Amino acid sequence: MINREIPFRPRLEGEFRVRFYNAASEITEKTPTLTIARIAEREIEWVEKDCQYNIEQRKKYRAVWFLFRDLIRASWKACYRNGVIYMSLPTLNGTDMHDTTSPEVKALLRSWMSESRHERLVGYTDFINRMENPGTNKQSIAALIADGDELEKRIKRVHTGEIAIETAVQPYLQLVRENDRDVFTGLKTSEIWRYFRLTWSTPVETTPGRTMQYLIRDAAHPMHAVMGIASLENCAVQITCRDDYIGWNQKAFIERIVTVDNDRAKEEFKQLLVYLEDGIDGIDYSELCTAMVVKNPTDTDIQLLLDEASNAEQNRQQFLRNEVEGDVDDIEKSELGSISIDAERALYRRKRAEQLARLLSAKKAIRDLINAENFNEIWIDFCKSETGNSAIRSALVAQKTKHIGSSMMELNVCGAIPPYNEILGGKLVALLATSPQVIHDYKERYADKASEIASRLKGMPVCRPADLVYVGTTSLYYVGSSQYNRLKMPGSIFNTDFDIVWKKLGMTIGFGTMHISKATTMSLTEATSDGFNRINHVFGEGASPKMRLLTMSIRELLESTNEDSKDFSKHAMSRIVYGACLAENTFDYLLGKESKPKYYTDMADYVSGTQKIIDFWRNRWLKSRLNYEPIYRRIRDFDKQGFLISNQIDEDEEWSFSKLEEVTHMPTNDETKTGLQFVRDFYRGSSAYADHIASELLSAIHLETKLDTAIIESALSGKDIVLTGNPGDGKTHVIRMLKINWKARESQFALN
């Protein structure tokens, strides 16, 4: 359950631990969210401005409160009870907010993203100013934003019968190409798209792989104003409801296959073998095993491959450590990122060995099943077994891998630019994302382009067919998307029975980093930098760097299980998943049962095909909108100047993040400070020579004395211990050594 209670236990020590729980004890079930946020801000201010000792604990303390604050803002609930602060995430699509209306929920979700948007806009100030005030021989981006009065007059003339609807609004698709310039303003089309993307409330996330960006323009406007923007990018690998819909999920596969007869079941398993052989053929195994092993793998062969993968990963980690700790300026770098060629080779050796072992294991299991004399009696039990589930999953993943990056795209950006949103411009953008022009542009751009990851695994260029047959998307809000609701393109406009429908497939869980602010990200990086200096954008590391940072930092900063760590990456921003099939045989094509897609129209004549979609939008959606009288006033009232991004940035509120630094001055005697605080501040703080020595080296030079024993015995008897003396006499050394096996964690230390 997403909304189960999870203990929030920071790994803090000494006074920092005591202070955290003192602050947390102020939080009850009835404490308002705003009050909780103020408590977090108060503690962050204390550790930044007032606390001047123990830099390591200061960093962790700030990071913990930043993370706690972001979780609260993302509608996590907190309550201190029996010495522990418990947190739970309300399911916005469930009972926790069943009385909340769609507008209220959308307003709440927008508020979560407002801070990160401000941080983002401040970072783009120079770009925004350049686009709005471009200088000589160029016109401002404002020229591409329609005036409300002008658009209102145009569509009103249609309503009164003065002009045809085809004359009033004339949409067309413009593919953004590198270095192309807009003929009306002289601005780069890529920068025009980028500017309008910054008007979105959601953060801009760049993803590696294939990307196609579009401007939707209005030729009826003197400057061909931008009606909307779209971006199609590589699909997310794991979306369960989508994979169920297509047939790539082993659970759905098994539920379907157990309903067929024995002969049909055997054919289905033979198809799985085809998937596996295709996957194996995509791996360069020349340095891993022989062709005979691939043909007839044994359990021993598979284990040797797994051992090889483990060794390769150890080598990769060592190469990465060497790069971080040593002088590697002269090391040849990989094209994948800021890593060495050696680290890259180790990465792909691991990937090849892992994938080959998994595929060969599945191949052996399924082939043994097919060849079994008692197949009819055992195949259903095979489907229910752990071995069978694993083998089926591996085969389906192999087939999905073949198409996920070449036959499918995700509509990650889709929306209208005001004032065209008032005439359902968003629906136009969504329809055009499935148009013949998009299918044509995709094939033209990627038909001869090798797949980077597949090519590296194969050891040679791999060019897969660039036949786009599926476009997916997710709504911004879980409460529904009017943009995709009831949205379909009837086949009748192309003289076919095949309708293109944006079909609701299911829901995503709220999972990711959208609720984590930039300040929190930087604070987590600062607090855990020793462990995370190898987090990068290189293929092979797993999820996005920000997601890995969040997960790893939670494990280091909080006393939590792996399941709890993952749950803290969740937020209440669930989304609806939609999908649109672009070919009559999309499923059979993606499942390898047919070799070519059967599109709904002749893609060679993509221009007229796309125009039919535009005509359909005008007659189905725009025309009905013209009969809604309030629209004219809303379009007329559109504030073009207020829409300019520069007018949405508070110039007096520049965002900044200050790293915590060790106090370098000698603290002065303060008569108001007593006890531990006086002792702690008497000297220069906690940073000593031993703070900067690795634990292994410290252990090597440590000599255990009676002092170690005396400290432990005193702590176990419930005493607080103060180590005092002269700087450099080994106090920090002793404390760091005792921390390794320290059991009395409630004991308080005042270093130096």
Question: Where do the model's predicted regions map?
Answer:
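Walker A/P-loop nucleotide-binding motif
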Residues: 718-736
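Short, flexible/disordered secondary-structure transition segments
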Residues: 440-444, 722-725, 749
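Active-site signature of alpha/beta-hydrolase-fold catalytic machinery across serine-
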Residues: 431-432, 737-741
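A short, basic N-terminal segment
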Residues: 660-718
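Conserved catalytic segments around the Walker B and adjacent sensor/switch elements
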Residues: 745-752
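Short coil/turn segments at beta-strand junctions that form active-site/ligand-binding loops
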Residues: 212, 719, 747
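AAA+ P-loop NTPase catalytic core and its hallmark functional loops
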Residues: 697-699, 724, 746
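Extended, composition-driven regions rather than compact fold-specific motifs
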Residues: 2-662
